[in-house]
Amino acid sequence: MSGNFFIFLLLLVTPGEAKKSFLSFLNIQNTEMLSFTRTEENIVVRSSYKDKQPHSSYLLVKLEDPKVLQVVNVTKTSLAVTDFTVNLKTFPGETNVTLQLWESEGRQTTLIDELKNVRVRVFRQTDDSLLQAPIHVDSSIFLLVLSMILLNKCAFGCKIEFQVLQTVWKRPLPILLGVVIQFFLMPFCGFLLSQILGLPKAQAFGFVMTCTCPGGGGGYLFALLLEGDVTLAILMTCTSTSLALIMMPVNSYFYSRLLGLAGAFHVPVLKIVSTLLFILMPMSTGVIIKHKMPAKAICLERVVRPLSLTLMFVGIYLAFRMGLVFLRMANLEVFLLGLLVPALGLLFGYSLAKVYLLPLPVCKTVALETGMLNSFLALAIIQLSFSQPKAHEASVAPFTVAMCSSCEMLLLLLVYKAKRRPSLSTEYEKTPLV
């Protein structure tokens, strides 16, 4: 009886020993997806298998797509443990790799263990990448664009109405709606949609951080072009940027834990403060010009529309140039979420403002401020918090949202102007000539 029981135990143990994994990656933490950026990469595979004869085991690397990966050589190092160093030449794309451990005894070879269908993604960090190398722009062109931006913000300062500021101070409902949507509703929607679409953790975190960004300069620019309340838009942008110093670290901590991402997340305080100063200083100059030199303020107000349109197209061009390398990594789900994020911000802002019976220009402004996000603050958080290549993968989100929101707003502007044209021509025909 005891002999039969001992044999039964051996039968239980033997299959377990046969299924023991002898291979493991030594220099890679995330084995679900290997991400490479350089033209040549090395991976180290450790084998815990004890050779029956000296140097009888070897590693075979099988590549699914040789256009993405090519094996240069495999080097075996046997000291206390056995390591195989696989030298690979990489090309942009995705493929699968299978690693097999074989043992050779004379003419007979035996498969000992294998790591099947390990997913590999290769992408390049070219000069198009904002993070690795800036776009090469002539210094004179750079100074011209910078001067245009400062002049444009100064002109916006000339359009600030103190009566509107007093009204908002007494009834801050539009600002409160913007805060609730930007820092509570939008991050939750970003998290929920990223889970529904099954995005990787890094990309999901990128979208959540993009959704928790404050309003950007595009909000008050489009408030002007779409006949919203410019003063309210500027006030909402400054308020949300100030609150971002508190709300962005809170949301990054909360949602990173929900996504199962550990580590310290850094908030770019200097970048947020500099963004706020970059808005306030030239606009304060515009306010002073309006009160001290009204005639010059009128001239500045005349150029604000053409200047804003010019800067809008320059911004779209630069965003596409910088984001091109990231868009190569974007799939259908990422593009879909990139389109949904600004659209949801516009929808939530306009709908809630309408529910509270706010005037039409105010409804437009709340929608624009919650739909046009300063995505590049999310990019700064990602780059400070993650190591490459995870940071590169997460950076797809803010760039996709930035480009999709620019295209959506441009389309909205064209539709709005096309609808306005017939009504303007009708009003002109009805106007008496005398």
Swiss-Prot record:
Which GO BP terms, alphabetically?
A: sodium ion transport
Asked if Repeat is a keyword of the record, the answer is no
Q: Where in the cell is it found?
A: Membrane
Q: What is its main location?
A: membrane
Membrane-traversing stretches: 130-150, 173-193, 204-226, 233-255, 269-289, 307-327, 332-352, 366-386, 396-416
Give the record's glycosylation annotations as residue positions.
Answer: 73, 96
- What ranges are annotated Cytoplasmic (topological domains)? 151-172, 227-232, 290-306, 353-365, 417-434
- Molecular function (GO) terms listed? symporter activity
Bilayer disposition of the protein: Multi-pass membrane protein
Signal sequence coordinates: 1-18
- Could you list this entry's UniProt keywords, alphabetically sorted: Glycoprotein, Ion transport, Membrane, Signal, Sodium, Sodium transport, Symport, Transmembrane, Transmembrane helix, Transport
> Its domain of life?
Eukaryota
Record InterPro entries? BilAc:Na_symport/Acr3, Bilac:Na_transpt, Na+/solute_symporter_sf
Q: Which residues lie on this side of the membrane: Extracellular?
A: 19-129, 194-203, 256-268, 328-331, 387-395
Please provide, in alphabetical order, the Gene Ontology terms of the cellular component aspect for this entry.
membrane
- Keyword Metal-binding recorded: no
Q: Which family does the record assign?
A: Belongs to the bile acid:sodium symporter (BASS) (TC 2.A.28) family.
Protein name stated in the entry: Sodium/bile acid cotransporter 5
- Species annotation: Mus musculus
